[in-house]
Amino acid sequence: MNQQKLTHYDILIKPITTEKTMLDREKRKYVFEVNVLSNKALVKNAVESLFNVKVEKVNISLVKPKPKRRGRFEGKTRRWKKAVVTLKEGYTIKELEGQQ
C-alpha cells in the first residue's frame, strides 16, 4: 500500500493498553500501533482528525520481531511500528480513557 493512499483508519491500527501506557495517559501520552509505512506527520494528522484533539509531538519506533516456537516449528513475530502521541495541554482522548 502506497504512503499517499493511506487513510486515517489505515494509519492507526489499534491503541496499546498496558499498565505502563495507562500511567502515561496521565501525562497526556497515548500509545498506538501504527502502519509500518506511516510517518510522524501522517500519525499526527490521523489522531487530530479522528479524535478532535491537538497533538504536541509524536515519537515513533520500530518494534523488532521476537523469536517464537510452536512445537518443532520456529518462526518470528512480525515487526510493527509503535507511536507515542503527546497531546497539548487540556486535551484528552475520551474514547480511550474508559479502556481498561
UniProtKB/Swiss-Prot annotation:
Matching Pfam families: Ribosomal_L23
Keywords: Ribonucleoprotein, Ribosomal protein, RNA-binding, rRNA-binding
Gene Ontology cellular-component annotations: ribonucleoprotein complex; ribosome
Molecular-function GO terms, alphabetical: rRNA binding; structural constituent of ribosome
GO-annotated biological processes: translation
Keyword RNA-binding attached: yes
Gene3D superfamilies the UniProt entry points to: 3.30.70.330
Similarity field: Belongs to the universal ribosomal protein uL23 family.
Biological role: One of the early assembly proteins it binds 23S rRNA. One of the proteins that surrounds the polypeptide exit tunnel on the outside of the ribosome. Forms the main docking site for trigger factor binding to the ribosome.
Record text on subunit structure and interactions: Part of the 50S ribosomal subunit. Contacts protein L29, and trigger factor when it is bound to the ribosome.
Protein name in the entry: Large ribosomal subunit protein uL23
Gene: rplW
